[in-house]
Amino acid sequence: MSCTIEKALADAKALVERLRDHDDAAESLIEQTTALSKRVEAMKQYQEEIQELNEVARHRPRSTLVMGIQQENRQIRELQQENKELRTSLEEHQSALELIMSKYREQMFRLLMASKKDDPGIIMKLKEQHSKIDMVHRNSCEGFFLDASRHILEAPQHGLERRHLEANQNELQAHVDQITEMAAVMRKAIEIDEQQGCKEQERIFQLEQENKGLREILQITRESFLNLRKDDASESTSLSALVTNSDLSLRKS
């Protein structure tokens, strides 16, 4: 009796597992059927749109079609020209950013050399600032220009690709705006660093002038002291001569 119950339970368990497998297979079939139905629906819609376009094209005269094609070709040429201008603008922005970064590195090096004997905290702060800005510049420039070069396409041959190119150009223009904004930030940072460098140079010049004045005062004091010593020596010599002369006169008398 117990064997039959265990066998029945095992059979029931096997049936449950088979039912689960069948359910999984049914769900996958349902998903595939849904995807196929969506694809068929999209193909039907595409076919209907093509038929509508063909009907419209049949009713339109050829001159209108030729004019439309010419206008589209003109727009394509304009988009090609815009692509060239955007590419040139990207190259100019890249060269400008490289120049800005080289000037910034040179200014930072000067500040580090000028502040080397003043405060080690300033040196660490300047190094951290330089590394952060350099990393931001490298990552942003590489990402922006790689995306820009990837999205510059050749001229399209029909309306859908032309809209795709316009979207790419909008994205490219956004990248150019971001690069321009970053260049403005870099210019502002360089101006601040130049102001700090001018302050440091003014301080160094002031200290040099003070040092020069102190050296002149010291030289004048030293010369005065030497002159006083010479005067004292001459006075002592004259006094000794007078004493000698008076002694001789007394002896003669």
Swiss-Prot record:
An annotated GO BP: response to wounding
Intracellular or extracellular location(s): Cytoplasm
Main location: cytoplasm
Regulation: induction: By wound, in oral mucosa undergoing tooth extraction.
This protein's record includes keyword Transcription regulation: no
Bias-annotated ranges (Polar residues): 235-253
Modified residues (Phosphoserine): 140
Coiled-coil stretches noted in the UniProt entry, renumbered to this chain: 5-104, 160-223
Region (Disordered): 231-253
One GO cellular component term: cytoplasm
Gene Ontology MF terms: identical protein binding
UniProtKB keywords: Coiled coil, Cytoplasm, Phosphoprotein
PANTHER family registered for this protein in UniProt: FGFR1 ONCOGENE PARTNER 2 (PTHR12186:SF3), SIKE FAMILY MEMBER (PTHR12186)
Functional note: May be involved in wound healing pathway underlying the favorable early wound closure characteristics of oral mucosa. Accelerates the collagen gel contraction in vitro.
Family that this chain belongs to: Belongs to the SIKE family.
Protein name (database record): FGFR1 oncogene partner 2 homolog
Organism: Rattus norvegicus
